Amino acid sequence: MTAAPVSPREIRERLLQAIDKQSNIQNMVAVLEVISSLEKYPITKEALEETRLGKLINDVRKKTSNEDLAKRAKKLLRNWQKLIEPVTQNEQLVRGIPNLPGSANGGGSHNCKADPAPTNLLAGKPIQELKGRNDIQKAHSPKADKTPKRKRKEHRDGGQGTPGHLSKPNHELFQNSSPPPTNGIGGSPPDNLPSPLDGGLQSNNRLEPAENDKHGKIPINAVRPHTNSPGLVKHPSTSSLLKVVVLQQHSGGLDDALSHQPRSPRCSSFSPRGTRAELATRQHTTYAPKGSAPSPSQRLPGVDSAHQSPLHPSTPPATAKRLESPRQDRVSSPHKPVEQLPSTDCHQVLPRTSQQHIPRSSLVDSQTPRTGFSPESSKLDSDDAASGSDNLKRKKSRLRIECEGQSADGTGKPARVKKERRLTFDVITGQIKPLTLKDPAQVESSAPTEQHRTETDKQDLTLSLPSPFQLTNWKELSGNEIIQSYLHRQSSLLSSSGIQTQSAHYYMSEYLKQEECTKRESRKTHVLVPIVLPSDLPGRTREITSSDTDRIQNQHWPGVNGCHDTQGNWYDWTQCISLDPHGDDGRLNILPYVCLD
């Protein structure tokens, strides 16, 4: 007959019987049998977790002195460890696969770091499937490789190419990106764009038909590169800027038809870089000094003729005159020193004046990109800011004249006098008073009302508020020389100003006097009253009577049932007394019957 198979619980019980609580082996034969049975038994992970046999075997291995048993237990534990941790090894295998080039977000030339996939998804997939996916991505990496090169070429040209070349990335963006959210205008198809953009798209289709054919040759299962990947679109704000430009062109088409211009400046370029460059240069010219003339490199050959054409047709003639006159003065005398404005004035005045005097069409033109930078437009902006800052300066000077007491009309009207705000706080009375009054007329006019008000305030304050010097902790301040010199100087200032009050020095001296008195009193020694031996001693000179027993039980009898100290306190023989025999605040705790020499 064959024995029944042993379960892990029975093995655990047998092992626990063979060892004690500190895992010391009590029965070596039983432990060796348990190790042999565990080496033969096909144990599972669930059984190990349930019985905690690994911990028991490890404790036995540490405590045993038998090397053969320790080696067998260690080998057994290693086998169990492999059984418990296969999942982590698979994760390490998947994690150890290197990132292959040609991924969707990097292209061939950009070895961007790919985001690691979740391990729970990759653990169950074979490595061949991963290799197949990377091979598919490799096959289509030249397309992703061409796009960044073309982008770099456009940025090197600086946005000065033909409209057809510039609109090609826009055409790819419209094809690859998902349609924008329809908010009324943004969902319109590319067919509704103005004629220059249509021409650019048609020329783009004629120039590069092979590039568009490559999109159709991509297999269905291949991973298309995402439009937001850094290899395709370098600037995240490019698409948003292009949408703004297209919407502005679509809304401004009627204005272009009415103005009869030979060529509108907003239709010449669609490069978002031009927009940023122009905004930066406009800011620099706004904060530049007014007297500096533009350099010849900034002045283009067709600037003067283009400026004479009606770029701002809806500008009022009064505004044009006001904008034109400072520029004519500067042209007539270019080396004339002009007053430079602070940058803060220009910054404060420019938004206000530009919103007041520039109409809507010119604002739209200022937001749209232009082919070149015109120094004349920067002159107009700086002149506009200068005129607004002149008005602000005029207002400031008028306010300053009125505050200083001069009449604005030139007549003899009584002007307002500046308020005297030099006040001081009187620490004695707790009132706020003017320190010095410059104008004697003001002193005479304000004297009656001030006197009446301060008298009532004085009465209330003297009744209600104590002096702050009486509430001060003078013990801490009395030993400080800096505080003493400061208070002495303050008291001299108060006495020189004519205020008849008790100074801080007075309170300091009073406090010091009190401190001296208390110190003298504290220097007195605190001892027991010396007991004079009486001539009448009951029990020695005479017999003890009932009055003696009553006195010793119910009355204070110095030297018999207690004693007095120098402060008049009575102490029983069993009470502890705290004395100061030397007067130096040193306390001596003794019992009253102790004799002090």
Curated annotation (Swiss-Prot):
PROSITE patterns: TFIIS_N
Pfam family, one: Med26_M
Annotated GO MF terms: transcription coregulator activity
Domain of life of the native organism: Eukaryota
Protein name, entry field: Mediator of RNA polymerase II transcription subunit 26
Biased composition (Polar residues): 226-236, 341-377
GO terms for cellular component: core mediator complex; mediator complex
UniProt keyword Nucleus, yes or no: yes
Region named Disordered: 96-236, 254-418, 436-459
Upper classification of the organism: Eukaryota, Metazoa, Chordata, Craniata, Vertebrata
Family: Belongs to the Mediator complex subunit 26 family.
Record GO biological process: positive regulation of gene expression; regulation of transcription by RNA polymerase II
SMART domains to which the protein is assigned, alphabetical: TFS2N
Record's subcellular location: Nucleus
Chain ranges of the TFIIS N-terminal domain: 10-87
Keyword Oxidoreductase: no
Composition bias, Low complexity: 262-273
